[in-house]
Curated annotation (Swiss-Prot):
The flexible hinge domain, which separates the large intramolecular coiled coil regions, allows the heterotypic interaction with the corresponding domain of SMC5, forming a V-shaped heterodimer. One of its GO terms (biological process) is chromatin looping. ATP binds at residues 76-83. Gene3D superfamilies: P-loop containing nucleotide triphosphate hydrolases (3.40.50.300). The modification Phosphoserine is found at residue 669. GO terms for cellular component: chromosome, centromeric region; chromosome, telomeric region; interchromatin granule; mitotic spindle pole; nuclear speck; nucleoplasm; nucleus; PML body. Residues 22-34 have a biased composition (Acidic residues). GO terms for molecular function: ATP binding; ATP hydrolysis activity; damaged DNA binding; DNA secondary structure binding; single-stranded DNA binding; ubiquitin protein ligase binding. This is Structural maintenance of chromosomes protein 6. PANTHER family: STRUCTURAL MAINTENANCE OF CHROMOSOMES 5,6 SMC5, SMC6, STRUCTURAL MAINTENANCE OF CHROMOSOMES PROTEIN 6. Residues 452-659 are annotated as: Flexible hinge. Core component of the SMC5-SMC6 complex, a complex involved in DNA double-strand breaks by homologous recombination. The complex may promote sister chromatid homologous recombination by recruiting the SMC1-SMC3 cohesin complex to double-strand breaks. The complex is required for telomere maintenance via recombination in ALT (alternative lengthening of telomeres) cell lines and mediates sumoylation of shelterin complex (telosome) components which is proposed to lead to shelterin complex disassembly in ALT-associated PML bodies (APBs).
Length: 1091
C-alpha cells in the first residue's frame, strides 16, 4: 500500500475533515476536549454513488444501481448477490483477493465460462475537498477489468465519461485523498472477517484490529519509514563527506597545478636531479640484493654444515641402533644356541635317568633274591643241624607209615609251590605295570607343571593389561604407560619455564586417530614402538626430555624412544613417492593427524606413505606377491596385524590392539574373559596336577604292596621248597652216615658265606646305583630348569629386538630424510650462487650506466620505486605544463569549478546535517502527539462502547495495553454487579452479535472513512437485540449524515422507521437461466405501500 500523505498523521485538531460528535454524557474528562470538531450535514466526497458488475463471480450482470448518501440496506436471500456487491466494492477499489475471504486469486472472481469480468464504481467528488475537480468533475468513475489469468487493469473516468488515467497510482491517490481504506475492517467488514475477529483468542490480534481501524497502524508505519529515511540520509551524509574529501584533494591538485605554471624550469631541474638519484638508487638496490643473497648463501652454507652434522649424528645413531640390534640378536642367538646345545644333553640325561632307575630296580631285585637265597640257606642249615641231632639221638628207623605220610606231604607242598610261583609271576607283572604308570604320571606331572607356569605368566601379563585399560578409561594417556600423564605434566612445566625450544610432541599414538577402527591392529603392527615415541625439535630438547624421563623410568627399564627432527608447520608433500592403490589406503591416508610434526615424524621414521593396509589376508598376498605389486609400495599389513612383503609373509604375535582401540569397554570385557579363562585353566591344571599326584601316591602304595606281596610269595616258595627238601632228605637211605650230613651242613655253610658276600656286593652296587640315579635326576632337573630360564630370558629380548628393528628402520629413514633435505638444500644453494654471479654482473652494468648519467656517486635515501613514481609524476606535470603553457585561463577555470563543486557539496552536507537534527526534533514532537492522539482515540472508543452497551443494560470493559500491544474485551450481559464479566466468545449468538455491533459502532465513531459497510450484522440476533442494534445504527447514521452506511442483511427490514435518509436495495432471488439480477432501489414509503 502506498504511503499516506503526511497530513494523515497529524493530531485530531488538524484532521482533514473536522467534525463534532454528539458525545452526550461522554464529555466527563478533559481528554475529550482535544477531539471536538464541527458537524457536516451531507456527504460531498468519497461516498459510493453506484456499482455495476458484469461476469463477476456467479453473476452475468448485476446492476447498475445507486446508493443513497446516508443509510443503505441491501437485503435479499442467500445467493441473491449481496456478497458479490461487497466483494466487488473491495476488489474494484484496488483491494486484494484475499481481503474478501472469497478467493485467493482474482481469476477466481471471473464467472465460469467467461474470459473476463468488469467492475464499475462511481464515487462522489463535490465541494471544497473534491479531488482534481477541474479534471474529474462531480464524480469519478472507476472501471476495473479482470482477465481470466488473474491480471487486472484500470480506467479512471471523469463525470463526462472521458478517460483521465489508467494508472493504479492515480487510484491510490484518489483513495488517499478521500481517506478510503478498503482493507480496513471498520470501513468494510465482511461476515467472515467479523467471525475470525470474534473467535480470535489472541488479544494482540484485537489490538492490531483497533490500530488498523483507526489508521494508527499506518501512522506507526509512516514513522518507521521516516526513521529509515533518516538513516539513509545519514548514510548519504557519510558518502557526501567521503566525496568531500576526494573533491578537496582534487581542488588542492588543481590549485597546485595553477601555482605550478611558474615553476616549470624548477621542475625540469628537479627531474634531472631525480634521474641522477634514480641511477644510483638502482645500484643501491642491486647492492642490497647482493648483500641479501650473500647473507642467504652464508645462512645456507651454515645450514648445509648443520645438515652434515645432523647426518653424521644420524649415522652415529644408526650405527648405535644397528649395534644395539646386533647385540640383542647375538644375545638371542646365544640363548638359542645354548638352548639347542642343552637339548641333546637334556634328552641324554633323561635317558640316563631312565637307565639308572632301571639299573637300580634290577639291582634291588637281585639283592632281594640273594637275600631270600641267604635266608633259605640259613634255614637249610638250621634244619641239617637239627637232623644231625635227631639222627644222633635216634636209635630206631622210621616206619613205613611215616614214609607214606612224608610222600603225601611232599606232593601237597609241590602243588603249593607251583601255585605260589604262578602268583609270583602275576605280581611281578603288576609291579612292572605300576612302575610304568608311575613313570608316565611323573612325566605328565612335569609337563603340566610347565604349562601351568606358562599360563600363570600369561595371566600376569593379561592382568597388567587389564589394569592399564581400566586406568585408561579415566585417562587415555595411561594406555601408553602408567607414567605418561605425569611425564606430560612435567613436560608442560618445563616448557613453561623455558627449558624447551619447542614443546615436545608425544606420545605419537595419542596424537593420531583412526578413520577405520578395524585397522587398529594393522596400524599398531606397522608403527610398533613409534606409538610410544616423542618428537623433539633439536638435541638440546632431547637431552632435557631424557632427563625428565629418568625421573619416571627406573634404570634398566625400557623408555619411550625419542625422535629428533626440526619441527615444521606443514606436512611433507609425498605425492610423488606415496604408494597408491584404488581399493586400499596407506597408513598415512588411514589416519587423521592434526599435527604436522607427528605426520612428518611418522613419514620420516616409518615411511607410512608407502605402506598399504589390506584387511583380508589372502587379498593382501594376492596384491603384494603378484607380478606387479602397487607402485611405491614396500609392504602391507592385514587387519590381523600380519606383515606382507613381495616375497615374504610374517604372522603377527598380537591378537588385539593395545593403544589405538576405541572400544575400551569391549577390550576390557575380552581381557576379563581371558583372565577368567586363564584362571579357570590354571585351576583345571592344578586339579589335574593334584589328581596326578594322588595317582602317583596311590600307585606307589600299590607298588609297595605288590613288592611286599612278592617278597612274601618268595619266602613262602623258599619255605615250601625247604620243607620238600627236608622231607626228601628223610626219604634217603636211612643208613646215611651222620658224617655225610655234617659234610652237607659244612657245604651249606660255605654256600651261605658265598651268598652273604655276594649279597653285600649287590647291596653296595644297589646303593651306588641309587646315588647315580639321584645324581642323574638332579642333573636332569638342573638342565631343565636352565632351559626354562633361557626361554624366560628370550621373551623380553624378542620384544627389545622388535623395538630395535623399528629403531634401525627409523634411523635409516631419518638418514634418508636428511640426505634428501641436504640434496634439496645444496641444489637451492647452488642456485643462489648462480644468482649471485648474475647479480654481480648486473651490478657492474648498472654502475657503468650510473657513471654515464652521474659520474660522481651520490647518497640516495629514497628507494628506486619511490623515485620512479616521483619522476613519472614530475614528467606528467611537465608534460601537462607544456600542453597548457600559455592557457592560464583554462587552468584558472578548472580550479574555480573544482572549488565551487567542493563548496556546493559542503553546503549540501551541512544542510542535510541541519535537516537531520531538525527532523529528529520534529519526530520527537510528532511521536508525543501520536501518543496523545492514540490516548484520545482509546478513551473515545471506551466511552462509545460503554454507552452503546448500556442501551441493553449491558456493561463492558476494554483494556488497552499499548506497551505489549494487546486489547482485551469483556461484556457483562446482566444487570449491574449481578453477573460476571465474560469474554465475548462466552456469550450467546445474539449477545455476541449485539456486542460486536457495539464494538464496530465504537470504532465507526472514531474512524475517518467516508463510508462504512457491514455484512449480515444481525444474522445471529434475536428480535429484541436486532431492534436495539438497528436503532443504534440509525441513530449514529442520523448524527453522521456526512458519512454513508451500507448494511447487508437477509432480513426484510419491514420494521424500519420512515425516513428519506434510508434507502433499501432489495435483491430478488435469481430464476433458473436468469442472467441479469433485478436490482432496484426502494424508499421507505414504497416498501410500506408494497406491504
Amino acid at each position: 500500500m502506498a504511503k499516506r500523505k503526511e497530513e494523515n498523521f497529524s493530531s485530531p485538531k488538524n484532521a482533514k475533515r473536522p467534525r463534532q460528535e454528539e458525545l452526550e454524557d461522554f464529555d466527563k474528562d478533559g481528554d475529550e476536549d482535544e477531539c471536538k470538531g464541527t458537524t457536516l450535514t451531507a456527504a460531498e466526497v468519497g461516498i459510493i454513488e453506484s456499482i455495476h458488475l458484469k461476469n463477476f463471480m456467479c453473476h452475468s450482470m448485476l446492476g447498475p444501481f445507486k446508493f443513497g448518501s446516508n443509510v443503505n440496506f441491501v437485503v435479499g436471500n442467500n445467493g441473491s448477490g449481496k456478497s458479490a456487491v461487497l466483494t466487488a466494492l473491495i476488489v474494484g477499489l484496488g483491494g486484494r483477493a484475499v481481503a474478501t475471504n472469497r478467493g485467493s486469486s482474482l481469476k477466481g472472481f471471473v464467472k465460469d465460462g467467461q474470459n473476463s469480468a468488469d467492475i464499475s464504481i462511481t464515487l462522489r467528488n463535490r465541494g471544497d475537498d473534491a479531488f482534481k475537480a477541474s479534471v474529474y468533475g462531480n464524480s469519478i468513475l472507476i472501471q476495473q477489468h479482470i482477465s481470466i489469468d488473474g491480471s487486472r487493469s484500470y480506467k479512471l473516468k471523469s463525470a463526462t465519461g472521458s478517460v483521465v488515467s489508467t494508472r493504479k497510482e492515480e487510484l491510490i491517490a484518489i483513495l488517499d485523498h478521500f481517506n478510503i481504506q478498503v482493507d480496513n475492517p471498520v470501513s468494510v467488514l465482511t461476515q467472515e472477517m467479523s467471525k475470525q475477529f470474534l473467535q480470535s483468542k489472541n488479544e494482540g490480534d484485537k489490538y492490531k484490529f483497533f490500530m488498523k481501524a483507526t489508521q494508527l497502524e499506518q501512522m506507526k508505519e509512516d514513522y518507521s519509514y521516516i526513521m529509515e529515511t533518516k538513516e539513509r540520509t545519514k548514510e548519504q551524509i557519510h558518502q557526501g563527506e567521503e566525496r568531500l574529501t576526494e573533491l578537496k584533494r582534487q581542488c588542492v591538485e588543481k590549485e597546485e597545478r595553477f601555482q605550478s605554471i611558474a615553476g616549470l624550469s624548477t621542475m625540469k631541474t628537479n627531474l634531472e636531479s631525480l634521474k641522477h638519484e634514480m641511477a644510483w638508487a638502482v645500484v643501491n638496490e642491486i647492492e642490497k640484493q647482493l648483500n641479501a643473497i650473500r647473507d642467504n648463501i652464508k645462512i645456507g652454507e651454515d645450514r648445509a654444515a648443520r645438515l652434515d652434522r645432523k647426518m653424521e649424528e644420524q649415522q652415529v645413531r644408526l650405527n648405535e641402533a644397528e649395534q644395539k640390534y646386533k647385540d640383542i640378536q647375538d644375545k638371542l642367538e646365544k640363548i638359542s644356541e645354548e638352548t639347542n646345545a642343552r637339548a641333546p644333553e637334556c634328552m641324554a640325561l633323561k635317558a640316563d635317568v631312565v637307565a639308572k632307575k632301571r639299573a637300580y630296580n634290577e639291582a634291588e631285585v637281585l639283592y632281594n633274591r640273594s637275600l631270600n637265597e641267604y635266608k633259605a640257606l640259613k634255614k637249610d642249615d638250621e634244619q641239617l643241624c637239627k637232623r644231625i641231632e635227631e639222627l644222633k639221638k635216634s636209635t630206631d628207623q622210621s616206619l613205613e607209615p611215616e614214609r607214606l605220610e612224608r610222600q603225601k606231604k611232599i606232593s601237597w607242598l609241590k602243588e603249593r609251590v607251583k601255585a605260589f610261583q604262578n602268583q609270583e609271576n602275576s605280581v611281578n607283572q603288576e609291579i612292572e605295570q605300576f612302575q610304568q604308570a608311575i613313570e608316565k604320571d611323573k612325566e605328565e606331572h612335569g609337563k603340566i607343571k610347565r604349562e601351568e607356569l606358562d599360563v600363570k605368566h600369561a595371566l600376569s601379563y593379561n592382568q597388567r593389561q587389564l589394569k592399564e585399560l581400566k586406568d585408561s578409561k579415566t585417562d587415555r594417556l595411561k594406555r601408553f604407560g602408567p607414567n605418561v600423564p605425569a611425564l606430560l605434566e612435567a613436560i608442560d612445566d618445563a616448557y613453561r619455564q623455558g627449558h624447551f625450544t619447542y614443546k615436545p610432541v608425544g606420545p605419537l599414538g595419542a596424537c593420531i586417530h583412526l578413520r577405520d577402527p578395524e585397522l587398529a591392529l594393522a596400524i599398531e603392527s606397522c608403527l610398533k614402538g613409534l606409538l610410544q615415541a616423542y618428537c623433539c625439535h633439536n638435541h638440546a630438547d632431547e637431552r632435557v626430555l631424557q632427563a625428565l624421563m629418568k625421573r619416571f623410568y627406573l634404570p634398566g627399564t625400557s623408555r619411550p624412544p625419542i625422535i629428533v627432527s626440526e619441527f615444521r608447520n606443514e606436512i611433507y608433500d609425498v605425492r610423488h613417492r606415496a604408494a597408491y592403490h584404488p581399493d586400499f589406503p596407506t597408513v598415512l591416508t588411514a589416519l587423521e593427524i592434526d599435527n604436522a610434526v607427528v605426520a612428518n615424524s611418522l613419514i620420516d621414521m616409518r615411511g607410512i606413505e608407502t605402506v598399504l593396509l589390506i584387511k583380508n589376508n589372502s587379498v593382501a598376498r594376492a596384491v603384494m606377491q603378484s607380478q606387479k605389486p602397487p607402485k611405491n609400495c614396500r609392504e602391507a599389513f592385514t587387519a590381523d596385524g600380519d606383515q606382507v612383503f613381495a616375497g615374504r609373509y610374517y604372522s603377527s604375535e598380537n591378537t588385539r590392539p593395545k593403544f589405538l582401540s576405541r572400544d575400551v569397554d569391549s577390550e576390557i570385557s575380552d581381557l576379563e574373559n581371558e583372565v577368567e579363562n586363564k584362571t579357570a585353566q590354571i585351576l583345571n591344571l592344578q586339579q589335574h596336577l593334584s589328581a596326578l599326584e594322588k595317582d602317583i601316591k596311590h600307585n606307589e602304595e600299590l607298588l609297595k604292596r605288590c613288592q611286599l606281596h612278592y617278597k612274601e610269595l618268595k619266602m613262602k616258595i623258599r619255605k615250601n621248597i625247604s620243607e620238600i627238601r627236608e622231607l626228601e632228605n628223610i626219604e634217603e637211605h636211612q643208613s646215611v652216615d651222620i658224617a655225610t650230613l655234617e659234610d652237607e651242613a659244612q657245604e651249606n655253610k660255605s654256600k651261605m658265606k658265598m651268598v652273604e658276600e655276594h649279597m653285600e656286593q649287590q647291596k653296595e652296587n644297589m646303593e651306588h646305583l641309587k646315588s647315580l640315579k639321584i645324581e642323574a635326576e638332579n642333573k636332569y632337573d638342573a638342565i631343565k630348569f636352565k632351559i626354562n630360564q633361557l626361554s624366560e630370558l628370550a621373551d623380553p629380548l624378542k620384544d627389545e629386538l622388535n623395538l630395535a628393528d623399528s629403531e634401525v628402520d627409523n634411523q635409516k629413514r631419518g638418514k634418508r630424510h636428511y640426505e634428501e633435505k641436504q640434496k634439496e638444500h645444496l641444489d637451492t644453494l647452488n642456485k643462489k650462487k648462480r644468482e649471485l654471479d648474475m647479480k654481480e654482473k648486473e651490478l657492474e652494468e648498472k654502475m657503468s650506466q650510473a657513471r654515464q648519467i652521474c659520474p660522481e656517486r651520490i647518497e640516495v635515501e629514497k628507494s628506486a620505486s619511490i623515485l620512479d613514481k616521483e619522476i613519472n609524476r614530475l614528467r606528467q606535470k611537465i608534460q601537462a605544463e607544456h600542453a597548457s603553457h600559455g592557457d592560464r585561463e583554462e587552468i584558472m577555470r578548472q580550479y574555480q569549478e573544482a572549488r565551487e563543486t567542493y563548496l556546493d557539496l559542503d553546503s549540501k552536507v551541512r544542510t542535510l546535517k541541519k535537516f537531520i537534527k531538525l527532523l529528529g526534533e520534529i519526530m520527537e514532537h510528532r511521536f508525543k502527539t501520536y501518543q496523545q492522539f492514540r490516548r484520545c482515540l482509546t478513551l473515545r472508543c471506551k466511552l462509545y462502547f460503554d454507552n452503546l452497551l448500556s442501551q441493553r443494560a449491558y456493561c463492558g470493559k476494554m483494556n488497552f495495553d499499548h506497551k505489549n500491544e494487546t486489547l482485551s474485551i469483556s461484556v457483562q450481559p446482566g444487570e449491574g454487579n449481578k453477573a460476571a464479566f465474560n469474554d465475548m466468545r462466552a456469550l450467546s449468538g445474539g449477545e455476541r452479535s449485539f456486542s460486536t455491533v457495539c464494538f464496530i459502532l465504537s470504532l465507526w465513531s472514531i474512524a475517518e472513512s467516508p463510508f462504512r459497510c457491514l455484512d449480515e450484522f444481525d444474522v445471529y440476533m434475536d428480535m429484541v437485540n436486532r431492534r436495539i442494534a438497528m436503532d443504534l445504527i440509525l441513530k449514529m447514521a442520523d448524527s453522521q449524515r456526512f458519512r454513508q452506511f451500507i448494511l447487508l442483511t437477509p432480513q426484510s427490514m419491514s420494521s424500519l422507521p420512515s425516513s428519506k435518509l434510508i434507502r433499501i436495495l432489495r435483491m430478488s432471488d435469481p430464476e433458473r437461466g436468469q442472467t441479469t439480477l433485478p436490482f432496484r432501489p426502494v424508499t421507505q414509503e414504497e416498501d410500506d405501500d408494497q406491504r
